[in-house]
Swiss-Prot record:
Family per similarity comment: Belongs to the Casparian strip membrane proteins (CASP) family.
Compositionally biased intervals (Low complexity): 87-96, 114-127
InterPro entries with a match to the protein in the record: CASP_dom
Subunit structure: Homodimer and heterodimers.
One GO cellular component, as annotated: plasma membrane
Major subcellular location class: membrane
All ranges on the Extracellular side of the membrane: 244-262, 322-339
Name recorded for this polypeptide: CASP-like protein 4U1
Residue ranges with Pro residues bias: 7-23
Keywords: Cell membrane, Membrane, Transmembrane, Transmembrane helix
Organism: Zea mays
Cited PANTHER family: CASP-LIKE PROTEIN 4A4, CASP-LIKE PROTEIN 4U1
Basic and acidic residues bias spans: 36-51
Amino acid sequence: MASTPRTPAPERSPPPVPTPPPPLEDEPPPYLADGSPREEASFSSDGREGAPPKNPQLSPTHHAAPRLVPPPSSPARQDGQEQEGSANKAAAATAEPAREPLRQMATGLARPLSSQTSPATTNSPTPSASPTPSSPAPVANNSKRSGQSTPKRAETKLPLSSPAVAVHFDPVEEAVTSPLRLGKARLDQQQQQQHAAGAAESGASVVPGVAAAVAAVAERRELLLALRLATAVLSLAAFSVIASARTSGWAGDYYARHLQYRYAVAVNVIVFAYSVAQSLGKIRHLVSPRFTFRTMSSYYCSLFLDQVLAYLLMSASSAAASRNDLWVSRFGTDAFVRKITGALWLSFVAFLVLALNAVISXANLFSMV
């Protein structure tokens, strides 16, 4: 199988080589514009003494990140970089300084962007970053104001609190001079004045509620005294007749032999003593004006005792009446049975009068309440 001949490559002209512009005669080389003292001593004004010509000035290299640092270069290249850096510094010094933007580093501190050197422009042979210049320590901000350039709104000054004053607390004085008590007394006084003004306009006398209740109780005091005395007299007559009832002879009888009669005598004695005590109290209220007012406990006690003694007197009279009826059904009627029957009638009447006393006591209690 025959081989196919290859087509020769087309002939191309070589790329043009750029030629640098000729340097001016009266302008010194750029790398000698602002050199180090050693370089100034080595070279003359025309730049032809003692050493070969330097490399032309190169533009600065910008890297994407500090970690992408090129490997260390040769000494000749390092010398060129030093000359390039010195030339850049001289050009920056001769040119008009421009305002550089400030970057906030800390509260109250600002540093220009030029102070932060990039690791790519340093002459260190290692890829480590160059140390930043030492910055002054931040000053303690005692005025509690921000380091920003924008002014803040003036702080409002709060008034100083007055010091606490210790006051002795007297519970008795507080109870007497309490605003609640003073306010209640003032309200009662205003109400009394309003009632008095209304009575003067209408021409009728207005009596406070407590005075009206006391007046109502006083009106029933004579009736209650009469009922107390009647109860005492009836109970006295009842237990006296029962105690005096007896017969002589072999068929004679006596009240102490029967439990029901003894129970009726005991209850009548208690009712008599209670009625006498209540009658003395009513007489004292009628005679002496100092004892016009009574406490609420006395009204409650009177109502309670009236009801309890009325129930006891009713039960005792009923028990004695049942025993007397049994005696009559067995042995007939005689003088002893007739006396017991009369005494039991007096005991029942005393019960009715004592029940009326209980009703009046309840009326007096609810009048005061």
